[in-house]
Amino acid sequence: MSGSYYLPVREDWLARRSEPALDPDLPIVDPHHHLWERQGWRYLLHELLADLAQGHRVVATVYIQARSMLRAGGPAAFRPVGETEFANGVAAMSASGFYGPTQVCAGIVGHADLTLGAQVREVLEAHLRAGGGRFRGIRHSGSWDADASIRNPAYDPPPGLLGRPEFREGFAELAPLGLSFEAWVYHPQIPDVTALARAFPETRIVLNHVGGPLGIRGYAGRQAEVRAAWHAAMTELASCPNVRVKLGGLGMRINGMGFEQGEEPPSSEALAAAFRPWME
């Protein structure tokens, strides 16, 4: 994947399509969004509020870690707590009612390095203190592929992360604190999530982005093969009662659907047709 891992936001391109909300009275909790400010692009509270004002009734949102507003100093293990402090500040702004009825960042999922083993408990407790009662869990990415050009350089875990003893030692600290785990992996690692869920049946696991089916580089042109492997892995994962799956996140470049290459954004019908095989 050449260039930046993330696509630039093209407001002029996005403006080429507008559709009315399908069910404007349906209450929605957005379970997965980020807030950040990076060089050349910004998506903070006001940008999120602009998107929320497009006709849907979004009553609350859940903030998911994205390496945003980390602490600038102090022990490295505790720097991700800065992101929880930031998200909780946004939540407090939203809770004032000044910005409208949506409870933004009503839930917060942060990051902690679970390979710290049992020592990660201090970091988890710091997140809970910083979260103002909103902190719900940890995301520690296991998204790895042998092709380094597919991997996100911001989250470049070693292969087999979820099965490593030090990771599992840290993972064991989640359930006693009532915390869940957000699993962000590519589809070849779904069996690792299944093994983790079976080893820790008391821990709630949320699989991100439908398991991250890949469709670029060596996976390009192999959709039937990828889907067969993905389907088999997801069927096995479905036997774990402590796992839930987020239905979304299929429009990224790594999925290979090519939406970003169109003259205009895809319609809701086009998105539904493309996503249907991964969600039915």
Locate the predicted segments by residue.
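Mid-domain alpha/beta scaffold segments of enzyme catalytic cores
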Residues: 1-177, 199, 217-221, 227-228, ...
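Catalytic pocket-lining loop regions of alpha/beta-barrel enzymes
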Residues: 157-280
